[in-house]
């Protein structure tokens, strides 16, 4: 019978991905080797997506700002009427085609994310071919307060732990952040015609039962993103006051990272245990925890049958 100090267990494996330097005239970062990088947009409407071409659920996504997001179907109907009455002027199309965010929450934003991505592709030429993440059937598991740059002026600013189906139909899991800000209020015909704006948009994701293993490398990559100082200055010069607040760009990314770390520390470990058991079942492991430290390890199948000590217990 194995003794506690000589048991055949090992720490949970983390992905053996290595990071490499990557840079453009807009930003630089450390990206996972072999992964694709897309960067597109203009000014504060800039998006970055870093993803594994073999499995697009494995990704880092960041966008500085998205607007407009309408407040109601009644508002959208009004804008569509203005669009028709003004001979389909492109100025009104921006609003006539906009996505309705019934609830100004981070959860509703990600529930509508596929629709929002399609809309942005259609109205912003510099993002016309940008491949937004596919987040079908987005479901919130947990939510945490964020430390995001726009939190103080936001209606909602959260980090969500959520699940989704990716573009391959595979189940994914990740951490998702945004801040939803009200642009203002202007009523006509009983509808508020103004809109919400989304800032601090960032997601890190992987396959559902692998996210716990990918989290660290994804966070390290996301946290390494640095915007070129000339790009930041030009965008600040072109922007308004709120834009300037959001545009301490590199500080915003640090705040996003801090938000993620805080959220991860606060998470419900029960989700991790369920994910790990599912993952282990296909790999022929069983999961045990150290009763003295609380750390979780992988052991060979049948370990708990062989082991009669008290220190290591099966994770249930």
Which residues does each PLM region occupy?
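Surface-exposed amphipathic alpha-helical segments
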Residues: 35, 200-244
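Sequence-level motif detector for i,i+2 pairs with an aromatic at +2
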Residues: 14-19, 26, 155-157, 197
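Proline-anchored loop/turn motifs at beta-strand termini and strand-loop-strand connectors
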Residues: 24-42, 221-228
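N-terminal low-complexity, Pro/Thr/Ser-rich intrinsically disordered segments
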Residues: 2-20
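Short aromatic-glycine motifs in intrinsically disordered, low-complexity regions
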Residues: 17-30, 208-219
């Amino acid at each position: 019978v194995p003794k506690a100090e000589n048991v055949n267990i090992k720490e949970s494996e983390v992905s053996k991905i290595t990071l490499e330097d990557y840079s453009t005239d807009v930003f630089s970062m450390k990206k996972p080797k072999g992964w694709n990088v897309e960067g597109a947009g203009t000014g504060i409407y800039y998006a970055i997506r870093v993803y594994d071409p073999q499995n697009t659920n494995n990704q880092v996504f960041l966008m500085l700002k998205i607007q407009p997001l309408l407040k109601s179907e009644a508002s959208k109907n009004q804008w569509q009427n203005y669009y028709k009455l003004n001979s389909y002027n492109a100025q009104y199309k921006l609003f006539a085609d906009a996505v309705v965010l019934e609830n100004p929450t981070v959860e509703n934003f990600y529930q509508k994310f596929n629709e929002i991505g399609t809309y942005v592709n259609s109205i912003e030429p510099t993002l016309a071919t940008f491949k937004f993440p596919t987040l079908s059937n987005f479901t919130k598991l947990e939510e945490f307060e964020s430390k995001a740059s726009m939190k103080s002026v936001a209606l909602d600013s959260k980090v969500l732990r959520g699940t989704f189906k990716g573009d391959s139909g595979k189940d994914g899991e990740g951490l998702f952040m945004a801040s939803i800000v009200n642009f203002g209020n202007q009523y006509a015909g009983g509808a508020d015609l103004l809109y919400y704006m989304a800032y601090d948009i960032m997601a890190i994701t992987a396959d559902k039962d692998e996210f716990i293993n990918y989290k660290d490398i994804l966070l390290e990559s996301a946290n390494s993103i640095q915007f070129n100082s000339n790009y930041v200055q030009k965008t600040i010069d072109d922007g308004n006051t709120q834009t300037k607040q959001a545009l301490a760009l590199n500080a915003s990314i640090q705040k996003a990272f801090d938000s993620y770390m805080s959220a991860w520390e606060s998470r419900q470990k029960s989700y991790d245990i369920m994910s790990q058991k599912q993952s282990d079942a296909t790999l022929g492991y069983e999961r045990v925890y150290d009763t003295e430290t609380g750390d979780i390890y992988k052991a060979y199948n049948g370990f708990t049958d062989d082991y009669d000590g008290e220190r290591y217990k099966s994770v249930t």
